[in-house]
């Protein structure tokens, strides 16, 4: 799924958003970029305040135990839904003990593109988009906002496999 050239890419690059004239992350990113001075004002409070449903987490933990699960996330640091859902997602995976090495995070501009075109083949229309893969085959997406909650929607995707 993830081409080898990504390992050589610079992480957490920023550029100026033309509409807001503010810095936004672009391209391949990770949690460190989201927790940097530019973006921690929304990441930390949302991460800390999100209340996880522990019953669903227990079921999720069982669902991912023996899987080859990987997740690609496409988000915009300029996007309110991304600012809300991405910290919640990280709290969920931290609670699950899910390895960040199985997560690829791309930040896009308002056209839903990166400068290097990494997301061009993913058919992104709204952000954030969480794409779940089992053994490199797409098994489901959460687009923009969850239907119920992130952890419930994740469980629903994994339960259909």
Which positions does each model-derived feature cover?
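Bacterial Sec-dependent N-terminal signal peptides
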Residues: 1-13
């Amino acid at each position: 799924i993830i081409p080898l050239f990504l390992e050589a890419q610079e992480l957490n690059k920023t550029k100026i958003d033309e509409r807001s004239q503010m810095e936004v992350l672009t391209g391949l990113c990770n949690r460190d970029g989201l927790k940097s001075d530019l973006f921690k004002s929304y990441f930390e409070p949302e991460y800390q305040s999100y209340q996880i449903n522990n019953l669903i987490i227990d079921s999720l933990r069982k669902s991912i135990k023996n899987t080859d699960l990987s997740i690609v996330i496409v988000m915009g640091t300029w996007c309110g839904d991304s600012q809300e859902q991405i910290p919640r997602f990280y709290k969920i995976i931290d609670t699950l003990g899910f390895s960040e090495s199985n997560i690829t995070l791309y930040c896009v501009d308002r056209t839903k593109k990166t400068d290097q075109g990494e997301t061009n083949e993913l058919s992104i229309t709204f952000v954030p988009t969480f794409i779940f893969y089992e053994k490199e085959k797409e098994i489901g997406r959460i687009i923009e906002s969850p239907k119920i909650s992130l952890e419930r929607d994740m469980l629903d995707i994994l339960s259909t496999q």
